[in-house]
From Swiss-Prot:
The keyword Methyltransferase does not apply. This is Adult-specific rigid cuticular protein 12.4. It comes from the Eukaryota. Residues 9-87 form the Chitin-binding type R&R domain. InterPro entries: CHIT_BIND_RR_consensus, Cuticle_Struct_Prot, Insect_cuticle. It comes from Araneus diadematus (European garden spider).
């Protein structure tokens, strides 16, 4: 394993590399209240993952390999492809005018009609 450290006037630098199969390494430098650096390791799939970071008044920010590993991401995508999908939404139907029944008693309504002889133009309805 390699390791180094430097301190000077409130600033520092350090780093290490394990040099083994885990591939762990780290480098960092900083001053009072802030730091920048990176670290690396070999994950369970054999992939080297490296993260760069900074920390200071704006908080901790990491970039690089900060998500899930590619094997887990591929397995999740395969599972999502097998998941049931919602059926497509039906097309909206055209509006239909409502059917409003007519009131009883208007001419032409259902019922019985009797035409009385001798009374021209008169019909009784009941």
């Amino acid at each position: 394993a390699d390791m180094g450290m430097t301190l000077a006037g409130g600033a520092y630098n350090f780093g290490f590399n394990t040099g083994d199969a885990t591939g762990h390494s780290r480098v960092e430098s900083g001053t009072a209240g802030s730091a920048v650096g990176s670290y690396s390791y070999i994950d369970a799939n054999g992939d080297r993952r490296t993260v760069q970071y900074s920390a200071g008044p704006d908080g901790f920010k990491a970039t690089g390999d900060v998500g899930v590993d590619r094997k887990t991401a591929a397995a999740a995508a395969a599972m999502a492809a097998l998941a049931p999908k919602a059926p497509p939404a039906p097309a909206p139907a055209a509006p239909v005018a409502p059917v409003v029944p007519g009131a009883w008693g208007y001419w032409g309504a259902p019922g019985y009609s009797v035409i009385l002889p001798g009374l021209a133009g008169y019909a009784a309805r009941w």
